[in-house]
């Protein structure tokens, strides 16, 4: 199922969100507060809500300063709207397939700990979405869980990646034989659980715009694809900002 993004709905949601945030104090003022959180599953906010959001971050290069900055605005919005929010942190130098094994254990423990939550939304951003794909690949059917990938590549043609990043990707793929290019059979069959892909226009995605191929251009049977436009409310929808727009839609 392929869905073109609804600009009108997001405009309304954006206005609501701006009003909400302007009337209250943010829980997180900086990415530095998120950076201090230990690896593993952590509670960002607990409430009586029947919905639980589980966030999974992506990869950060060694030179990256604002680690987890992309989650500050989404987390503040979720807290203000009193939605159960959890953050799964991990060593992004580990293989996503290995990370997913630990995540699935943490996810099962979390579901058992919060039986009153009847809908779980797992949201992986960028390489966090790769963790989501390995997670859903090895998950039993659970209709209470919806898996989301945001700004996540679905395949990698290393020969068409700019030289500036090619070497690091080659090293990761050599280290991790189970990688993005291992999903061909799984994608053709589809997954047991519901999967929603939130895709950007490749040319407006800072992570992928210089690639000589479209890493989003891969079909996953029975998944839902939400295609973002190049901009919303005058703001470019890029690799980072698409996460916030996706969260707005997921919880509304």
Language model segments and positions:
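Catalytic metal-binding/acid-base residues of hydrolase active sites
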Residues: 59-60, 91, 151-154, 201-203
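Hydrophobic/aromatic beta-strand patches that form the interior of the parallel beta-sheet core
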Residues: 54, 86, 148, 196-199
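Active-site catalytic motif of lipid deacylating hydrolases and related acyltransferases
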Residues: 25-118
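Classical Sec-dependent N-terminal signal peptides that target proteins to the secretory pathway
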Residues: 1-25
């Amino acid at each position: 199922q392929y869905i073109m993004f609804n600009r009108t709905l997001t405009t309304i949601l954006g206005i609501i969100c701006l009003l909400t945030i302007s009337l209250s104090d943010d829980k997180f003022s900086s990415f530095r507060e998120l950076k201090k959180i230990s690896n593993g599953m952590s509670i960002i906010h607990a409430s009586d809500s029947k919905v639980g959001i589980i966030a999974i971050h992506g990869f950060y290069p060694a030179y990256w300063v604002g680690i987890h900055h992309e989650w500050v605005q989404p987390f503040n919005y979720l807290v203000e709207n009193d939605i159960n929010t959890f953050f799964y942190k991990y060593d992004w130098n580990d293989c996503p397939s290995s990370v997913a094994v630990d995540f699935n254990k943490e996810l099962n423990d979390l579901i058992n700990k919060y039986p009153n939550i009847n809908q779980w939304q797992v949201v992986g951003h960028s390489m966090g979405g790769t963790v989501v794909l390995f997670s859903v690949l090895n998950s039993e059917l659970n209709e209470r869980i919806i898996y989301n990938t945001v700004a996540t590549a679905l395949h990698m043609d290393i020969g068409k990646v700019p030289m500036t990043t090619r070497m690091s990707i080659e090293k990761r793929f050599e280290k991790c034989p189970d990688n993005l290019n291992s999903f061909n059979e799984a994608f053709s069959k589809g997954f047991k659980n519901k999967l929603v892909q939130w895709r950007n226009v490749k040319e407006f995605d800072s992570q992928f715009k210089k690639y000589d191929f479209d890493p989003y251009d891969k079909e996953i049977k029975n998944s839902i694809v939400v295609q973002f436009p190049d901009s919303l409310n005058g703001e470019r929808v890029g690799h980072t900002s698409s996460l916030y727009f996706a969260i707005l839609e997921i919880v509304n």
